[in-house]
Amino acid sequence: MTQTNDKLVIAGREFDSRLMVGTGKYADFQQMVRAIEVSGAQIITVAVRRVNISDRGKESLLDHIDLKKYTLLPNTAGCYTAEDAIRTCRLAREAGLSDFVKLEVLGDEKTLYPNNEELLKAAKVLLAEGFTVLPYTSDDPIVCRRLEDMGCAAVMPLGAPIGSGLGIRNPYNIQIILESVKVPVIVDAGVGTASDAAIAMELGCHGVLMNTAIAGAKDPVAMAEAMNCAVRAGRLAYLAGRIPRKLYASASSPLTGIIG
């Protein structure tokens, strides 16, 4: 399978790019727009709290995003209870943003780890109300399977804490999740550089979502291009199939016909 016909499919929607990007922490909107363009991403996540829903007459980041070109993924960043997350998603829908949502329910301000108990409660309500839910969760295979069983369109386990740049800290759990669920697995949080994104894709993940790794780089536009290449390279390497790891050497040239 080539990358030409290798689509990411979420809830029946097809995407050519497996990289999803956020919109926060950029120096200005112009830098954000350029980085998004270079990243090749088609799904753009936006914190509902950062969108001026009450006064659309004021400048908003949505003024700089071509909604005909990109799929908007409103997120519930900053929510610490199921009730708050549910209310935020309803606001996004009422404002005409989308019912295709990234659900976050955080446990505390220090780690920004997900509160899975509250996450499951929020997901149940939102799914019943017809939302397409993509939940940010821990790298717990059991929780991911429960989210899939509930009807979530994908699961989004963290690679490491949000904004930490620590990379994929527990690839073994990610592999177990990949074996445990049939919906797309998208690594969300922890990516720091291009090699981290490539590793996630080489493991077999269906996509990677990031913000700080690009927006916080010295040159966000250059990093966006690097992430674009890394995600595509990692996916292609996964499809190609790596050679098995072995303890001892294996000659790459035939030993027959050796002189002497």
UniProtKB/Swiss-Prot annotation:
Enzymatic reactions = [ThiS sulfur-carrier protein]-C-terminal-Gly-aminoethanethioate + 2-iminoacetate + 1-deoxy-D-xylulose 5-phosphate = [ThiS sulfur-carrier protein]-C-terminal Gly-Gly + 2-[(2R,5Z)-2-carboxy-4-methylthiazol-5(2H)-ylidene]ethyl phosphate + 2 H2O + H(+)
- What's a single GO BP term from this record? thiamine diphosphate biosynthetic process
Q: Name one GO cellular component term.
A: cytoplasm
- Which residues of the sequence carry a binding annotation for 1-deoxy-D-xylulose 5-phosphate? 163, 189-190, 211-212
Residues of the active site: 102 (schiff-base intermediate with dxp)
Cite the entry's keywords alphabetically: Cytoplasm, Schiff base, Thiamine biosynthesis, Transferase
Q: What is its EC number?
A: 2.8.1.10
Q: Where in the cell is it found?
A: Cytoplasm
Q: Which InterPro entries does the annotation name?
A: Aldolase_TIM, Thiazole_synthase_ThiG, ThiG
Q: Name one Pfam family in it.
A: ThiG
Range of residues in the leader sequence: none
Main location group: cytoplasm
Q: Which GO MF terms does the UniProt record name?
A: thiazole synthase activity
Query: What pathway does the annotation place this protein in?
Result: Cofactor biosynthesis; thiamine diphosphate biosynthesis
Q: What class of enzyme is it?
A: transferase
Q: What does this gene product do?
A: Catalyzes the rearrangement of 1-deoxy-D-xylulose 5-phosphate (DXP) to produce the thiazole phosphate moiety of thiamine. Sulfur is provided by the thiocarboxylate moiety of the carrier protein ThiS. In vitro, sulfur can be provided by H(2)S.
Q: Which PANTHER family match?
A: THIAZOLE SYNTHASE
UniProt family annotation: Belongs to the ThiG family.
Could you describe the subunit structure of this protein?
Homotetramer. Forms heterodimers with either ThiH or ThiS.
What is the protein name stated in its UniProt record? Thiazole synthase
**Which gene name does the record give?**
thiG
